[in-house]
């Protein structure tokens, strides 16, 4: 989860988020190099007193500044496309979780099991226990197993929502009348927080998401207690 005064990403807890973090660093390095070069050229132009007025065109320079941006765009596009295809890759899921957005709460259904569904509302500040997070805790957490492929089916009952968990690199729109799909796989157990990331009305800020990722054995014990 995020920490106070944090400037970077949250710690990655899924392979997709790790790839997104690497891509961010890769792109930021390219942007930094380009910005440094531009600032260096501008400083030279402002400080030098020499001018070259006899040259009307420079074929070599024009060739370089045409090819170089194309190469830079390719260096950015290739890893971006790779991650895009990884995020859209469909594998045989071990578990399917259907998520519905409402104004202003989430409902979840474990479609592989009968009668296993519940609503998840934000815990009011007056009901928080010591150590719990304001505006991020819910009355019913989503419990999922780690290191297993989980298919998320996401839609909405009313207006646009967006189911987002930053640590897992998941952000999928919940659109009324449309069923969107996302694949979720975590590399380690823990509690991960998210929020609705699409303006959906007056209480948009009060739609937290809490995932509790546990080993398979503990997940099976939770299932037995819920069924």
From Swiss-Prot:
Residues 46-59 are mitochondrial matrix. This is Cytochrome c oxidase subunit 2. It is an enzyme of class 7 (translocase). Component of the cytochrome c oxidase (complex IV, CIV), a multisubunit enzyme composed of 14 subunits. The complex is composed of a catalytic core of 3 subunits MT-CO1, MT-CO2 and MT-CO3, encoded in the mitochondrial DNA, and 11 supernumerary subunits COX4I, COX5A, COX5B, COX6A, COX6B, COX6C, COX7A, COX7B, COX7C, COX8 and NDUFA4, which are encoded in the nuclear genome. The gene is MT-CO2. Keywords: Copper, Electron transport, Magnesium, Membrane, Metal-binding, Mitochondrion, Mitochondrion inner membrane, Respiratory chain, Translocase, Transmembrane, Transmembrane helix, Transport. Residues 1-14, 88-227 are mitochondrial intermembrane. Cu cation A1 binds at residues 161, 196, 200, 207. Cu cation A2 binds at residues 196, 198, 200, 204. InterPro entries: CcO_II (IPR045187), CcO_II-like_C (IPR002429), CcO_II_C (IPR034210), Copper_CuA (IPR001505), Cupredoxin (IPR008972), Cyt_c_oxidase_su2 (IPR014222), Cyt_c_oxidase_su2_TM_dom (IPR011759), Cyt_c_oxidase_su2_TM_sf (IPR036257). GO terms for biological process: ATP synthesis coupled electron transport. The keyword Flavoprotein does not apply. One of its GO terms (molecular function) is copper ion binding. Its EC number is 7.1.1.9. It is found in: Mitochondrion inner membrane. SUPFAM superfamilies: Cupredoxins, Cytochrome c oxidase subunit II-like, transmembrane region. It catalyses: 4 Fe(II)-[cytochrome c] + O2 + 8 H(+)(in) = 4 Fe(III)-[cytochrome c] + 2 H2O + 4 H(+)(out). Component of the cytochrome c oxidase, the last enzyme in the mitochondrial electron transport chain which drives oxidative phosphorylation. The respiratory chain contains 3 multisubunit complexes succinate dehydrogenase (complex II, CII), ubiquinol-cytochrome c oxidoreductase (cytochrome b-c1 complex, complex III, CIII) and cytochrome c oxidase (complex IV, CIV), that cooperate to transfer electrons derived from NADH and succinate to molecular oxygen, creating an electrochemical gradient over the inner membrane that drives transmembrane transport and the ATP synthase. The chain crosses the membrane at residues 15-45, 60-87.
């Amino acid at each position: 989860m995020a920490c106070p005064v944090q400037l970077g990403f949250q710690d990655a807890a899924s392979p997709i988020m790790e790839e997104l973090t690497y891509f961010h660093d890769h792109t930021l390095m390219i942007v930094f190099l380009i910005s440094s070069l531009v600032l260096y050229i501008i400083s030279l132009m402002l400080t030098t007193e020499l001018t070259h007025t006899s040259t009307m065109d420079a074929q070599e320079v024009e060739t370089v500044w045409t090819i170089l941006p194309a190469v830079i765009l390719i260096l950015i596009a290739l890893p971006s496309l790779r991650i895009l295809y990884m995020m859209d890759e469909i594998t045989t899921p071990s578990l399917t979780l259907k998520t519905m957005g409402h104004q202003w709460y989430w409902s979840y259904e474990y479609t592989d099991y009968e009668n296993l569904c519940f609503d998840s509302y934000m815990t009011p500040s007056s009901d928080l226990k010591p150590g719990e997070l304001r505006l991020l805790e819910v009355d019913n957490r989503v419990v999922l197993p780690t290191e297993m492929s989980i298919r998320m089916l996401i839609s909405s009952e009313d207006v646009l929502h967006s189911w987002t968990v930053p640590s897992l690199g998941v952000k999928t729109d919940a659109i009324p009348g449309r069923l969107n799909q996302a694949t979720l796989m975590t590399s380690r157990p823990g509690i991960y927080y998210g929020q609705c990331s699409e303006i959906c009305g007056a209480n948009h800020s009060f739609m937290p998401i809490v995932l509790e990722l546990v080993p398979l054995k503990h997940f099976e014990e939770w299932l037995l207690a819920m069924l």
